[in-house]
């Protein structure tokens, strides 16, 4: 069973609470629709894998300001006692629709929708965006690494290089979601039910008088183990594994050797040759050391006999694309569409649905439509929560998300599965109804800005 650290309602930005008090003072309690989406793909990404929904659902179900939170807010001197008394009773009572975790999404497509009284939806913005953004970035990187490995196991080794303990656990989770075999991080494994993997450190070998003695001690305690062979000299370390095999005879059950430095191309081939000559064809080769999807792809293209990969730094920080232009924006309030016309940041108004078309099992195009439209394709967004409680049949599970993610990757056009930039842009159309509503709101905005002109149009409501 998952065991997670609780994050309280105070994980929010100050302006969320100041806006909440202003809404409260103005008696604004209408239903708002907020959507999370990103505007453009970062370099080196042809899609984004949506993730983080499970943590969002858990947070929303437990949302409340406790006494310590309220005491702190009172001490800021910006909030009235009456408002804080009211805030103490606030819970998330809204609905959530989302693309299930593991879904592949593209620019301007909502990953998550929150439909709730505006104060509730505003107060949860920081946490919701934090989790969807972080975990989607990490899952997208992991999906590329897993794809590069071509079915060989990939293991998350990155906890010590992650940006904090929470991020380390999220890396383990999203990597597994995206297809990794498991993690070395025990806390994450316990929290999320992820398989664990581990070898040994160079320090263990160094602590013994000889490398052979270290290998023998470890193999005696953990017979079906993996031995790290590059502490002093990689090929000499391989010879010591062979020596150990001769000494133990039928009791030798070492499953793999790990290469963690040097020219992995040359060393993996030499290691395989020595092991095979010694009759140890069953001993696999596991590689680590600064790997990412491009290095893994290059090693396999060179026919390196590597059977699995441990990936750390590049996985946990997604160094080539560590952030998304992801936003949490109001698209409707009190039954009316909302938008903004800032340069380069126009928002499509209204609650939306994404319709995805397939041909012969391959995604061939999406259409962004209004919620309730009936357009060709399968709708991506499904109900996750209603009235503040999760819908069990749609509640995200990690194993379910992992299976779904694999299906999503398998259905991508070949151009999007490629690690290289093929120049192919996945088509995302916008329905006529959304385009028409955006034009209507723009017309109304122009009329408001120039009241003496001859422009006529309905005046858009302002939030």
From Swiss-Prot:
Q: What induces it?
A: A member of the dormancy regulon. Induced in response to reduced oxygen tension (hypoxia), low levels of nitric oxide (NO) and carbon monoxide (CO). It is hoped that this regulon will give insight into the latent, or dormant phase of infection.
Q: Which UniProt keywords apply?
A: Ligase, Phosphoprotein, Pyridine nucleotide biosynthesis, Transferase
Tell me, in a sentence or two, what this protein's role is. Answer: Involved in the Preiss-Handler pathway, which is a recycling route that permits the salvage of free nicotinamide (NM) and nicotinic acid (Na) involved in the NAD biosynthesis. Catalyzes the synthesis of beta-nicotinate D-ribonucleotide from nicotinate and 5-phospho-D-ribose 1-phosphate at the expense of ATP. It is not able to use nicotinamide. PncB2 appears to be responsible for the increased salvage synthesis of NAD during infection of host tissues.
Family to which the UniProt record says this protein belongs: Belongs to the NAPRTase family.
Species this chain originates from: Mycobacterium tuberculosis (strain ATCC 25618 / H37Rv)
The molecular function terms of the Gene Ontology recorded here are: nicotinamide phosphoribosyltransferase activity; nicotinate phosphoribosyltransferase activity
Q: What is the lineage of its organism?
A: Bacteria, Bacillati, Actinomycetota, Actinomycetes, Mycobacteriales
Ligase among the record's keywords?
yes
What is this protein's gene name?
pncB2
- Which Gene Ontology terms describe the biological processes this protein takes part in? NAD biosynthetic process; NAD biosynthetic process via the salvage pathway; response to host; response to hypoxia
User: What EC class does the entry list?
Assistant: ligase
**Disrupted-gene phenotype:** Double mutants lacking both pncB1 and pncB2 show an absence of incorporation of nicotinamide.
Q: What is its EC number?
A: 6.3.4.21
Protein's name in the database: Nicotinate phosphoribosyltransferase pncB2
Q: Which SUPFAM superfamilies match?
A: Nicotinate/Quinolinate PRTase C-terminal domain-like, Nicotinate/Quinolinate PRTase N-terminal domain-like
Q: Where are the transmembrane segments?
A: none
One GO term describing the cellular component: cytosol
How is the protein altered post-translationally, as described in the entry? Transiently phosphorylated on a His residue during the reaction cycle. Phosphorylation strongly increases the affinity for substrates and increases the rate of nicotinate D-ribonucleotide production. Dephosphorylation regenerates the low-affinity form of the enzyme, leading to product release.
Q: Which reaction does it catalyse?
A: nicotinate + 5-phospho-alpha-D-ribose 1-diphosphate + ATP + H2O = nicotinate beta-D-ribonucleotide + ADP + phosphate + diphosphate
Pathway where this protein functions: Cofactor biosynthesis; NAD(+) biosynthesis; nicotinate D-ribonucleotide from nicotinate: step 1/1
Question: Residues where Phosphohistidine occurs?
Answer: 202
Q: Which Pfam families match?
A: NAPRTase, NAPRTase_N
């Amino acid at each position: 069973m998952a065991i997670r650290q609780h994050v309280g309602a105070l994980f929010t930005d100050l302006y969320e609470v100041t806006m909440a008090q202003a809404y409260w003072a103005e008696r604004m309690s209408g239903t708002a629709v907020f959507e999370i989406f990103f505007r453009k793909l970062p370099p080196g990404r042809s899609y984004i894998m949506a993730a983080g929904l499970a943590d969002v659902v858990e947070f929303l179900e437990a949302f409340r300001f406790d006494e310590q939170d309220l005491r702190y807010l009172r001490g800021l001197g910006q909030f009235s006692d009456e408002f804080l008394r009211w805030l103490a009773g606030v819970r998330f009572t809204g609905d959530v629709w989302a693309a299930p975790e593991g879904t592949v999404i593209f620019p301007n497509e909502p990953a998550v929708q929150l439909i709730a009284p505006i104060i509730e939806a505003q107060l949860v913005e920081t946490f919701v965006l934090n989790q969807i953004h972080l975990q989607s970035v990490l899952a997208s990187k992991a999906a590329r690494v897993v794809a590069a490995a071509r079915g060989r196991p990939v293991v998350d080794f990155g906890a010590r290089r992650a940006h904090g303990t929470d991020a380390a656990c999220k890396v383990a989770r999203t990597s597994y979601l995206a297809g990794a075999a498991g993690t070395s991080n025990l806390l994450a494994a316990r929290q999320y039910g992820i398989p664990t993997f581990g070898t040994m450190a160079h320090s263990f070998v160094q602590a013994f008088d000889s490398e052979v003695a270290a290998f023998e001690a470890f193999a005696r305690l953990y017979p079906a183990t993996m031995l790290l062979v590059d502490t002093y000299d990689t090929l000499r370390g391989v010879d010591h594994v062979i020596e150990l095999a001769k000494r133990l005879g039928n009791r030798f059950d070492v499953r793999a050797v790990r290469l963690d430095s040097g020219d992995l191309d040359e060393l993996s081939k030499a290691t395989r040759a020595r092991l095979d000559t010694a009759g140890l064809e069953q001993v696999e080769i596991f590689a680590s050391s600064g790997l990412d999807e491009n290095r893994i792809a290059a090693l396999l293209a060179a026919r390196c006999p590597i059977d699995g990969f441990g990936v750390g730094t590049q996985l946990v920080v997604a160094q080539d694309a560590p952030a998304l232009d992801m936003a949490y924006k109001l698209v409707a309030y009190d039954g009316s569409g909302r938008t903004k016309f800032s340069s380069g940041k126009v928002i499509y108004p209204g609650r939306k649905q994404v319709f995805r078309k397939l041909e012969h099992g391959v995604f061939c195009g999406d259409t962004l439509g209004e919620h309730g439209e009936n357009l060709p394709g399968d709708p991506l967004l499904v109900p996750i929560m209603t009235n503040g409680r999760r819908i069990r049949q749609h509640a995200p599970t990690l194993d379910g998300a992992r299976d779904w993610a694999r299906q999503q990757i398998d259905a991508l056009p070949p151009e999007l599965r490629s690690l290289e930039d093929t120049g192919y842009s996945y088509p995302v159309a916008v329905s006529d109804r959304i385009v028409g509503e955006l034009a209507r709101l723009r017309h109304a905005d122009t009329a408001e800005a120039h009241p003496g002109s001859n422009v006529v149009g309905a005046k858009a409501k302002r939030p």
